[in-house]
Structures are given as structure tokens and as C-alpha cells.
A protein has these predicted regions:
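Basic amphipathic alpha-helical segments that dock to polyanions
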Residues: 46-53
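Beta-hairpin "wing" of winged helix-turn-helix
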Residues: 56-71
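Amphipathic alpha-helical dimerization/coiled-coil segments
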Residues: 83-108
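N-terminal helix-turn-helix DNA-binding core of bacterial DNA-binding proteins
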Residues: 4-45
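Exposed loop/turn and edge beta-strand positions of beta-sandwich/beta-sheet ligand-binding modules
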Residues: 74
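Alpha-helical residues within the helix-turn-helix
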Residues: 31, 54-55
């Protein structure tokens, strides 16, 4: 892995893949992010991020069964790897440390 630093969108994608678990494929991940974050995501950005996270070893994928509903096309399902889980935990720890160190008066 090229370090365990995640960009904001990478973190969101990894967390969403974990949330969707067995239903984590490109379009579903994109729709879930758009719904939860009220933020539009292009299919190209989604695909590029999923590929990049898989190349980094943070995700793994498998092809699902072909269905007539999709014209025989198979969905590529994603799963967070152990390395991906570790990267998410490290990112969470950094964020929690930062929040813990913000003085109460900073937001008054």
C-alpha cells in the first residue's frame, strides 16, 4: 500500500462499501453516497476511485452472477480488505485526536 493516508472521497467510498457489504457495487455505492451526503458523484469518479482503492489493496472485488435484468452483464462487487480496515481505523484515530484537541472556545 502506498501509505495509509486516505483522501476524503476515498474514505467515504471505503465506508460506504463497508455499509453496503454484499450489495457494494459501483452504482449502489454512488447512489448511497449521493443519498447520505446530498452530493452528486459522477460514475467516472466513482469507477476511478474504486479501481484506485483496489490497486492500493484497500478493496477487493469479485464478479456476481449474470442476470437477465442486466442483459446478462455481471456486477462487480467490492469488499474492504484488512488493509482497508486498518487505513480506515488510522484515519478515524487521526480525526478523533484532532477533534479532541480543539478547545471548546474555538467554536463559540
Amino acid at each position: 500500500m502506498k501509505g495509509n493516508h486516505l483522501g476524503e472521497f476515498e474514505e467515504i467510498v471505503l465506508l460506504t462499501v463497508a455499509i453496503l457489504y454484499d450489495e457494494a457495487y459501483g452504482v449502489a455505492v454512488r447512489e448511497e453516497i449521493e443519498r447520505r451526503m446530498d452530493r452528486k458523484v459522477s460514475l467516472g469518479a466513482m469507477h476511478a476511485t474504486l479501481v484506485r482503492l483496489e490497486e492500493k489493496g484497500l478493496l477487493r472485488s469479485r464478479l456476481g452472477e449474470a442476470t437477465s435484468k442486466r442483459g446478462g452483464k455481471r456486477k462487480r462487487h467490492f469488499q474492504v480488505t484488512r488493509i482497508g480496515q486498518e487505513a480506515l481505523r488510522a484515519t478515524r484515530a487521526v480525526r478523533e485526536d484532532l477533534w479532541r484537541d480543539v478547545p471548546g472556545a474555538a467554536f463559540n
